Every structure is written in structure tokens, then in C-alpha cells.
């Protein structure tokens, strides 16, 4: 199964790629300074089979295998979002690991351009009618990796979370103390 890793140069990019390869994925790294929307657009227009998309700031654990994602969720789900342990929050969080079945691709290709100017285009795509009527998007509570560890651009991360009004969910003080160890 193909795994697309999207990166802007995160410190954990190589580790993310290695872990996915170790777990049995054929990995394609998309690493540049373009937006997530641009990367998603390229992936959706290139993919022709089921795939996973993983943020490069996620270090996948041994749970994230082609077999595990194929067995997760309901049979009618076209898009599964998994959990990770978030280093910034020091808690579980959704996202960072997405499994998309080929049945979703026509709808993603048709809709991705509508969200080119959105801060979170992938989240917006989960809300299109084809994914909720009937329900085709599913959040699966399986923890598939560690998100945010060894972030070297903490200022950018904090600014992004503030822009999304998510800062209260994060434990920046604990993260900074852990990083100082």
C-alpha cells in the first residue's frame, strides 16, 4: 500500500519515512514549502488505489501497517482518521494519519479546489456531503504514532495553533521542560 508523507522539512521526516517502510508501506515523500492544499491536490490526482497520508511530524508506531488500516473502521467508510499521541498537548489527538480508500478519490478530486484558501483544507474536505450522507468519514481511536516530537519550529507551531484558536488545548510549558531534559 502507498503512503504519502507530506513535509515542509520537519526534523522527524526521515524517521517517519523509515518507520512506514519498516511497517510495509511503499512511501512517497512530498517535501517542499508549498501549502498542504497543494500537496493534497497532487496526491488526490495521482492516487488510484487506497493509501495513507501521514504528516512528516508524526513518527508512526508498529500499529500503523497496511493490514491494520484495512481492518480498521466500518466497511462503508471511505476515509479513516486515526489518533496520535501529541507531544505538544501531552495527550491524544485526532489527525496526522489518514487512510483513504479509492472510492473517495472522485469526490476529493472534484472538491479539493473549493478549499484552496482554507487554513485546514483536509478538515474541510471531511465535511463535504459525500462523507456524511451516508457517513463515509470515520475517526478511529487506534493510536498510530507520536505527533510533534522534536519540533524545531515551535514558534511556527504555536502561531498556527493560536490562529486556529487551539492554544488552550496545548501544554507548551510541559513540552518546553521535556525538551530541555
Where are these regions (language model features)?
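Short, acidic, metal-binding catalytic loop of nucleotide-sugar glycosyltransferases
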Residues: 15-27
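Active-site nucleotide-sugar/metal-binding loop of Leloir-type enzymes
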Residues: 41-50
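Short beta-strand-to-loop acidic/aromatic patch adjacent to the donor-nucleotide binding site
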Residues: 49-59
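Acidic donor-binding/catalytic loop of UDP-sugar-dependent glycosyltransferases
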Residues: 58-71
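Short beta-strand-to-loop element that shapes/binds the nucleotide-sugar donor at the catalytic cleft/hinge
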Residues: 80-95
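Conserved nucleotide-sugar donor-binding
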Residues: 96-109
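A short, conserved alpha-helix in the catalytic core of glycosyltransferases
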Residues: 115-141
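C-terminal catalytic/acceptor-binding lobe
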Residues: 132-181
Amino acid at each position: 500500500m502507498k503512503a504519502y508523507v507530506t513535509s515542509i522539512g520537519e526534523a522527524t521526516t526521515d524517521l517517519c519515512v523509515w518507520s512506514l517502510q519498516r511497517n510495509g508501506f511503499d512511501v512517497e515523500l512530498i517535501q517542499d514549502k508549498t501549502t498542504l492544499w497543494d500537496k493534497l491536490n497532487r496526491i488526490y490526482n495521482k492516487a488510484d488505489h487506497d493509501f495513507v497520508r501521514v504528516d512528516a511530524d508524526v513518527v508512526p508506531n508498529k500499529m500503523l501497517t497496511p493490514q491494520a488500516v484495512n481492518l480498521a473502521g466500518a466497511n462503508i467508510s471511505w476515509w479513516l482518521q486515526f489518533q496520535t499521541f501529541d507531544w505538544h498537548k501531552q495527550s491524544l489527538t485526532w489527525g496526522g494519519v489518514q487512510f483513504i480508500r479509492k472510492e473517495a478519490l472522485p469526490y476529493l478530486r472534484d472538491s479539493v479546489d473549493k478549499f484552496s484558501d482554507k487554513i485546514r483544507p483536509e478538515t474541510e474536505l471531511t465535511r463535504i456531503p459525500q462523507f456524511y450522507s451516508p457517513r463515509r468519514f470515520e475517526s478511529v481511536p487506534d493510536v498510530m504514532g507520536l505527533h510533534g516530537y522534536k519540533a524545531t519550529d515551535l514558534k511556527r507551531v504555536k502561531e498556527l495553533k493560536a490562529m486556529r484558536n487551539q492554544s488552550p488545548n496545548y501544554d507548551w510549558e510541559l513540552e518546553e521542560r521535556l525538551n530541555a531534559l
